Amino acid sequence: MSSAAVVHHDDLMEPTLQSIINQKTLRWIFVGGKGGVGKTTTSCSLAIQLAKARKSVLLISTDPAHNLSDAFGQKFGKEARLVDGYSNLSAMEIDPNGSIQDLLASGEAQGEDPMAGLGMGNMMQDLAFSIPGVDEAMSFAEVLKQVKSLSYEVIVFDTAPTGHTLRFLQFPTVLEKALAKLSQLSSQFGPMLNSILGARGGLPGGQNIDELLQKMESLRETISEVNTQFKNPDMTTFVCVCIAEFLSLYETERMIQELTSYSIDTHAIVVNQLLFPKKGSECEQCNARRKMQQKYLEQIEELYEDFNVVRMPLLVEEVRGKEKLEKFSEMLVHPYVPPQ
């Protein structure tokens, strides 16, 4: 299990995310976990705390469910937009499954292409992009390119539920495979197809194969460069979010092992929805659930003794809107003290 390069030994047991706020070299922070454990609430709250310490913060949702708009009560889209009430916190929601057509189309309807009826463009597209994950990889690379040009000091990713979270790590390989396939097609059939399809080409946006190759190569370079940063613990860390239940703990352990195998730093776990029944409480369900949660909390502390483990309470209301998010975010840096 990895630990951050600049986190000092004295801070390792601190039950907060303060070490992440203090680590000024961080540029990329990923927040991930199983569905329904409070990832979006945690990533929004972390971004709010970072905005107090950094010049500019960008919060990006790559979860197709797009909960950022719901959390802040404000509509976000593909373009970065300032969050109401903040001068240095922006947010955007992107679809990681965006299609190749969206990326390459220049706004011309396919029906206007005289060759569209022959299906030549579609055939080339199907051949070139038959490798699984190419759409997603190119969409992600486009986002990274956009994010890099915007030059935010720190970027927080509210990721899709585990299973999709770590896909971006395989994208350079996926793009390399697609490039190799396209190069092969280009050398074998390129001149012939380009002449058949005419100057406008048969690919979306009227591009020919060489232009498409150049575009994919530039995207591959971007994604490879950023992936190098992802593996640098001074620049990137991953915050795991879970609840104190078996399946969530199992998923967290699997995710941490996968992150470690990719050399991605992780040293913080946020445990959400913890019950703190008052002493002498006669709520049978509350006490039974607390007992179960206590068992898994002990396992978390034993398994991840060199992690910052943050304990967050189950609240009586949904955490939605600026005020509630700010209140919740305070508990990420100041440990929650349950009422006696």
Curated annotation (Swiss-Prot):
Keywords (A to Z) from UniProt: ATP-binding, Cytoplasm, Endoplasmic reticulum, Hydrolase, Metal-binding, Nucleotide-binding, Transport, Zinc
GO molecular function: ATP binding; ATP hydrolysis activity; guanyl-nucleotide exchange factor activity; identical protein binding; metal ion binding; protein folding chaperone; unfolded protein binding
Positions annotated to bind Zn(2+): 283, 286
Residues bound to ATP: 34-41, 245, 272
Family matches, as InterPro entries: Anion-transp_ATPase-like_dom, ATPase_ArsA/GET3, ATPase_ArsA/GET3_euk, P-loop_NTPase
Gene3D superfamilies xrefs: P-loop containing nucleotide triphosphate hydrolases (3.40.50.300)
EC number: 3.6.-.-
Any GO BP annotation: response to metal ion
Pfam families listed in its UniProt record: ArsA_ATPase
Active-site residues annotated for this sequence: 63
Location (main, coarse): cytoplasm
GO terms for cellular component: GET complex
SUPFAM superfamilies documented for this protein: P-loop containing nucleoside triphosphate hydrolases
Enzyme class: hydrolase
Compartments reported by the entry: Cytoplasm; Endoplasmic reticulum
NCBIfam families recorded: GET3_arsA_TRC40
Sequence similarity: Belongs to the arsA ATPase family.
Role, per record: ATPase required for the post-translational delivery of tail-anchored (TA) proteins to the endoplasmic reticulum. Recognizes and selectively binds the transmembrane domain of TA proteins in the cytosol. This complex then targets to the endoplasmic reticulum by membrane-bound receptors, where the tail-anchored protein is released for insertion. This process is regulated by ATP binding and hydrolysis. ATP binding drives the homodimer towards the closed dimer state, facilitating recognition of newly synthesized TA membrane proteins. ATP hydrolysis is required for insertion.
Subunit details: Homodimer.
Record protein name field: ATPase get3
